[in-house]
Amino acid sequence: MPRFLHVGCGPKRKNQTVRAFAASEWEEVTLDIDGSVKPDIVDKLPELSRVESGSFDAVYSAHNIEHLYPHEVPLALKAMLRVLKADGFAILTCPDLQVLGERLAAGDIDTPLYTSGRGPVSPIDMLYGFRPAMQQGNLYLAHHTGFTMKSLGSACIQAGFANFFGFRRPRRHDLWGLATKTRRTEDEMRELGKIYLMPL
C-alpha cells in the first residue's frame, strides 16, 4: 500500500487532503510539531529529522512553507525530497502572493478575502499570519515568506526536484503545486496533476 507523509497536519487527516489520498488505497502518516494534535510523528520542518530517507511515496504539505523563514525553504524542500522514494512526489499548497499583491495595491488590507473554519481571513492575515490564532499564543502560524506560482516552482527545482506542475486558484487565494523526484514528461505531469491536485 502506498504511503503519504502528511506534513504539518494539525487536526486534519486524509479525508481533508486531496481526493486520491482520501481513498482506502493510500496510507497516511501524520507529522506535526504540535503533539497535542496527536500526529504519528512529532517533528518539524525544515529538517524532518525523524523521518527515514526514501520511505514515502508522496508528501502532502498544505500551508506550511509560508511559516518558514526564507533560508529554511530550500532545506525543507530538500528534506521532502529526501524522504521520498525514487518515483515519489510532493504536493504543496500555500497562499498566492500575486492575488494578495493585487489587494494590497488597492490599499485594502482589512476587508476579509474569505472565511475559514477559524473565522474571516484578511489580506494582512495572509501576509503575516492569522492574527486571532497568534493572539492566542500560536505563533507557529506567523508567516515569514511567500510565493507566486513562478517562485514556488523555481524553489522546488532548485531544491533538486526534477519537475514541477501547478496552478493558481485566484478565488481561493492559493497555489497548488506537484513536484516529482524523477523526471516526467509534460503530459505525465499534467496527468499526475489531474489525479492528485483535486482538493476535497
Language-model segment annotations:
Residues 1-10, 116-124:
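Conserved long hydrophobic alpha-helices within structured protein cores
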